[in-house]
Amino acid sequence: TKDKSFTCTECEESFSLKSRLIAHLLIHTGEKPFDSTKCGKGFRRNQYLKEHLSTHREDRPFVCTVCGKTYKYKHGLNTHLHSHKVNTYFPCSECRKIFSSKASLDIHLRHHTEKTFPCTECDKTFKQKKNLKRHQMIH
């Protein structure tokens, strides 16, 4: 295993590369340095911006009349429309994905926050269970 010598001072998660620590720190600051040139929406990671920019491409002529999401092919739009058939839907605030249940949205949100193990004593959450256990020893 690689030496993880770069540690976050907020949550004690460790990284083998300084660049990964810097990217991780955006979770705590809420900073979104990657802005869409089409609509101005900000993103924490360049990867999320690239995914978002594909929604602005002109070769996506099929538009959902409920939420505005666009599709390259009609069958993609038709599949998506099923998510609106239930009375309630749960959109992700970070990207434009929509979920038919809050549980599905909560699982998806982990991809944005990279936090999966919450401390029951405070508001901190951790990506790795071992870091949560280490943290819980301070309570």
From Swiss-Prot:
Annotated compartments:
Nucleus
Zinc finger spans (C2H2-type)?
6-28, 34-56, 62-84, 90-112, 117-139
List the Gene Ontology MF annotations in alphabetical order.
DNA binding; zinc ion binding
Keyword annotations from UniProtKB, A to Z: DNA-binding, Metal-binding, Nucleus, Repeat, Transcription, Transcription regulation, Zinc, Zinc-finger
User: Looking at the keywords, is Transcription present?
Assistant: yes
Instruction: Quote the InterPro entries the UniProt record gives.
Output: C2H2-ZF_domain-containing, Znf_C2H2_sf, Znf_C2H2_type
Coarse class of the primary localization is nucleus
Family stated for the protein in its record: Belongs to the krueppel C2H2-type zinc-finger protein family.
PANTHER family reported for this sequence: GASTRULA ZINC FINGER PROTEIN XLCGF49.1-LIKE-RELATED, ZINC FINGER PROTEIN 200
Task performed by this protein? May be involved in transcriptional regulation.
Entry protein name: Gastrula zinc finger protein XlCGF29.1
> Which organism's genome codes for this protein?
Xenopus laevis (African clawed frog)
